[in-house]
Amino acid sequence: MVSGCSNSAAPTLSPSESLPGGETSVSSQPFASFQLPAGNLPQALHPDFHAGKALAHQPWVRAPTITTARDGLGPIYNARSCLFCHINGGRSQMPESPDQELIGPFVRISIPGKDKIQGVVPEPIYGDQLQTQSVALSHQLRQVSQLKKVSLKAEEVKPEAYIYIDWQQSTFTYPDQTQVNLRWPKPRITKLAYGELNPDTMFSLRNSPPIHGTGLLELIPQSAIDDLADPQDDNGDGVSGRVNQVWDFEQARTVAGRFGLKANRANNLRIVTAAAFAGDVGITNPIFPQQPCTEVQTRCLKTANGNGEDGMEIPSNLLSLVTDFLRNIGVPKRSNWNSESVLAGRELFHQSGCQLCHHPDFTTAESSQLPHLSRQKIWPYTDLLLHDMGPALADGRPDYQASGSEWRTPPLWGVGLREAVNGSNNLLHDGRARTVEEAILWHGGEAEQVKQHFVNLKSAQRQLLIEFVESL
């Protein structure tokens, strides 16, 4: 067992645990959503919140058009809008059939090497992300009609590739002989449009995470996260979380990473938002002003853009609106948070050592710009640190200082509402886990001994622990 975790009693229950987002918490009734305004958002900010939400929803279109406020899509891209991937503010959905194209989730790529600024060395022809959509009319007809044999014309900008998922299967057997079917995705990349990939290309399939509570995560003091870091495992608990060091594209310097599945983005939601616009939608902006085309994609580079007078497809003020929409999304309140079974599961969660990475609570810092998010007691259940999760979950693709087997601990708040929010039950970085139980069973590396504690619980105890996680 992990040293000290099997005898770690849960702390005294706090009434604040019913409100994971503090005063920002919102009801999940009658309809669950991860895109509602924070419960304490001042009325004066509601118009901007809804304007930002509309911008996040709006589908961008090919330039040039008369709708100049939202033209400039692509020319190659993965999604037409922010919330196309983050459906209702939640996770994107993985394709279940091997004949269904990957749309929403995406594949990051790079080649071996280090780059202080980008964090990875992009593949020379295709960059650091495979764009599976394009503004080509033939491609659009192919998508709408599902006529997969429609051919793109020679003069049209082609999507970089089409991607499908072949699910691999295995069975996990508990000591009590209970069996669980597990699966993992194997991307199948077809119709590479611009030549062969570098033979050393590394691939990482990514499922889009939920976006609620990000403004609160942004306000967690870095010192509180640093206090949880233990890169050399000096305390001997078997867990050695560490902080990634990444490039801040606004400050032009290296800073602590916080956002992204490998904590590969700085603690600045404006940068996170701008990167998604540029890489996923193909929309140039003040932070990432380049089109998503590489040097060899000449037709892509020559395609008309939607740049305004400032040379950007989304200007600074509109980028800020979308960023503030993300910052001000409320966190759902918990239900049945103090029921007998949930409290029993809470005790088992701590006894098993889950809290060593899924750190329960923080208090946000003071912010004159965001006073309603300041000094909030929050319960996200994450330490926002990198942890080695073992070979089964490794993508083999380093990012800044994160290794190919390290991932940032994802927050657990709202995980039990995933089905109600948008029907997506795709957990973990690549959407392989369909249940909380499956997600736990995929844990390895630093979490292996904690997983073994869970595995060796009685079946009824395992269900109690899962019920607690689902209650978050």
Give the ranges of each region predicted by the language model.
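Periplasmic c-type cytochrome electron-transfer domains
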Residues: 5-472
